[in-house]
Amino acid sequence: MGDNTRVCRKPVDSKEVGLAFGLIFGKYFFNSHHLHYGYWTDDVPVSITNLPRAQEQYSDFIISHIPLGVKTILDVGCGAGALARKLTGKQYRVDAVSPCAILAAEARSILGDKCHIYETKFEQLDTDKKYDLIIFSESFQYIDIGRVFEQALRFLNKGGHILICDFFKTEAKGESSLGGGHRLTEFYETLKRYPLIVATDIDITKQTAPNIALVDDMLQNFGRPVWNLLFDYVGGRHPLLFKLINWKLKKKIEKINRKYFSGSRNSQNFQLFKSYRLVLCKSNPI
């Protein structure tokens, strides 16, 4: 007989669930460990089958902006280890940070002993090691902006660099169904308080917006039909339960419909409400 004992686990953050789902989806359908956006160029048609290629281009884009002379790198929010593996393949010495046990385990499985993974939040990282470059690839938005630069500077070698590739909130008017990201104005204001010089600042919103078009297409042509089918099934088989659910969870259901199935999560709104940027900063110790 199997062991049906349930083990009490600590609560799992919803972001971790989303990333773990993304990993399972990518591995099963594309044999890919990438969890970040794709970087879409004119020669790559926007389609779900081309997503792995666009994600590889995203990693290549980051690597192309690593300054000369960099030898050691800290990859903050390493996901499943795809970027770190690519970096070690180019002879960089890489360590990584991951607060998610599921993703950290996956990263260890593909990196082996090539990379030490700190299984902690970046804000809580404590090590004597220092690095030539710290990379935040779609992880910057999850870190306290009031603490991130002070913490990063602790682990930078003299004259080291910080590379951020992530999206930020713009000052566009109106309500956006697209969450995430620090305010871009706050980001620039915060930078001014630290001994950092912006060496590169590139807007890649146009090249990353097609990812949202793919998500919207999946929501409209897969997510919404499945959602409606579920409601039709429950309503037909259990009408009283259906009425209770609609009454009890009315506001949450309306929010889900508005956020995911209204068609507002599209590339046009992404380009309006978000600014996706690659920002490279050099430390300028006084």
Q: Where are the model-predicted features located?
A:
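Conserved alpha-helix/loop element of class I SAM-dependent methyltransferases that forms part
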Residues: P52-G69
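A short acidic, Gly/Pro-enriched loop at the edge of an enzyme's catalytic core
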Residues: Q124-I134
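N-terminal auxiliary segments of SAM/dcSAM-dependent transferases
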Residues: M1-F30
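Substrate-binding/catalytic lobe of Class I Rossmann-like enzymes that use SAM or dcSAM, i.e.
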Residues: E175-S264, Q268
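Class I SAM-dependent methyltransferase SAM/SAH-binding core
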Residues: L74-V76, A80-Q124
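A short SAM/SAH-binding and catalytic strip from SAM-dependent methyltransferases
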Residues: L133-I145
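A short glycine-rich, Lys/Arg-flanked "PGG" loop and its adjoining helix->strand segment in the class I
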Residues: G146-H161
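Class I SAM-dependent transferase core
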Residues: I24-E56
